[in-house]
Amino acid sequence: QKMRKWRIEDSEELYNITGWGTSYFGINDKGHVVVTPRKNGVGVDLKELVDELQLRDVAAPMLIRFPDILDNRIEKTSSCFRQAAEEYGYKAQNFIIYPIKVNQMRPVVEEIISHGKKFNLGLEAGSKPELHAVIAINSDSDSLIICNGYKDESYIELALLAQKMGKRIFLVVEKMNELKLIAKMAKQLNVMPNIGIRIKLASSGSGKWEDSGGDASKFGLSSSELLEALDFLAVSYTHLRAHETGAYLV
């Protein structure tokens, strides 16, 4: 039996390009991968681009970035949340936070910070080394810095010292011992900490991340621990207010 000629549609199905490429990647009539960073914008033939780079003596492997895709995803995230907020009557201020563990390369993070400024975009660090990187790269004093992950004294100290330097830093508490350590370090450094609390919801959702909720989830404070934390903060705040004014709980 004679085999039929391979078609563009066969390549699209084989590589599932419509599944992961969203509206950015596709296959043109030459059978080449084409990228369209902006909706209704000009497409770039990646095969022709690589050929042109090789003519300029640029050898493989090559790392090709498309900042417009980053910009467009930031805009899309902000737009979707804004629409949902309008639909459900959500009135509070909100911020987009980018975890730098996703991609720590400086050009990527700088592009995200630059374009995200008008969308209240901040950065998240999950460790002391990541916090060092965030502090160094994020010069916007109005941008939020969220500290997650395991917190020892040195990590907390760095966050509090950065706060004293004018950074808007929030330490997110996942365990009671972290809260007590933050209060201890804040008193030593004479600073009123900005504290966030991760809550372990009793009800779990559905889908891929359903195990991250519910009483059996690994992260966050239970309802009883939350009450304990609030009582602890009420007592600690009376001690800290002698040094600073103002407190934040998110």
Over which residues does each language-model region extend?
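Acidic-enriched catalytic cores of C-N bond-cleaving enzymes acting on peptides and small amides
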Residues: 235
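Conserved small/polar residues in nucleotide/adenosyl-binding loops
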Residues: 238-245
